[in-house]
Amino acid sequence: MNEVSTGASALRLEGLTRRFRSGEETLEILSGAEFELRAGEIVALVAPSGTGKSTLLHLAGLLEAPSAGTVFVADRPASGLSDTVRTAIRRDQIGFVYQFHHLLGEFTACENVMLPQLIAGVSPRKARERARDLLGRFGLSHRLDSLPGRLSGGEQQRTAIARALANQPKLLLADEPTGNLDIGTADHVFGELLRVVREEGAAALIATHNDELASRMDRTVTLRDGKLVPF
């Protein structure tokens, strides 16, 4: 476990509340949650299924709007921003890793990792160099030109992790990023993920059920009664 970063704020949640309607009932998944993640800090989110981990990550990544409270990305409040600006923040500052890869089937592994860079205006040459480097770090140098349908489930997930890191995001949000990998592969891939995040000075909030993986991060939080608390 590393010393907690004292860098600038990468993500801050203030009074974050999320309610859903279920028939005649209103379910409050998050209830005034408070949290701060600083640049260079990697935090594990460990909590049972159904407690709101995925909802929290969607709110933090500006994929959903809270019922109340505010999300700050790099000290910029997201409330009141247009959809266009929120999309630009997600594209330029945030990387997402989901448990299921969501790769584009008509593009090769290398092209899938290049694509977010090209959308952000990176030259094709630099985008390809970055994609080849990241895929190589995750053991996929021999799979650069393979379509997702020709990759194993583990290879698809590693490609998705490389894609999430492609634009050197300042904030990485990951939901069980190695949950579909075997134990040996998960250990290697997670170690490489941590190395890339630390080398590039990013901040990361990573949901995991794996206590051993959580112990390799700077600190661990959990969800209790709709609030984020130390684990």
Swiss-Prot record:
ATP binds at residues 47-54. Residues 11-231 form the ABC transporter domain. GO terms for biological process: lipoprotein localization to outer membrane; protein localization to outer membrane. It is found in: Cell inner membrane. Gene3D superfamilies: P-loop containing nucleotide triphosphate hydrolases. It is an enzyme of class 7 (translocase). It is a peripheral membrane protein. Pfam families: ABC_tran. One of its GO terms (cellular component) is plasma membrane. InterPro entries: AAA+_ATPase, ABC_transporter-like_ATP-bd, ABC_transpr_LolD-like, MacB-like_ATP-bd, P-loop_NTPase. Its EC number is 7.6.2.-. Its main location: membrane. GO terms for molecular function: ATP binding; ATP hydrolysis activity; transmembrane transporter activity. PROSITE patterns: ABC_TRANSPORTER_2, LOLD. It comes from the Bacteria. Keywords: ATP-binding, Cell inner membrane, Cell membrane, Membrane, Nucleotide-binding, Translocase, Transport. Part of the ABC transporter complex LolCDE involved in the translocation of mature outer membrane-directed lipoproteins, from the inner membrane to the periplasmic chaperone, LolA. Responsible for the formation of the LolA-lipoprotein complex in an ATP-dependent manner. Belongs to the ABC transporter superfamily. Lipoprotein translocase (TC 3.A.1.125) family. PANTHER family: IMPORT ATP-BINDING PROTEIN, LIPOPROTEIN-RELEASING SYSTEM ATP-BINDING PROTEIN LOLD. The complex is composed of two ATP-binding proteins (LolD) and two transmembrane proteins (LolC and LolE). This is Lipoprotein-releasing system ATP-binding protein LolD. It comes from Gluconobacter oxydans (strain 621H) (Gluconobacter suboxydans).
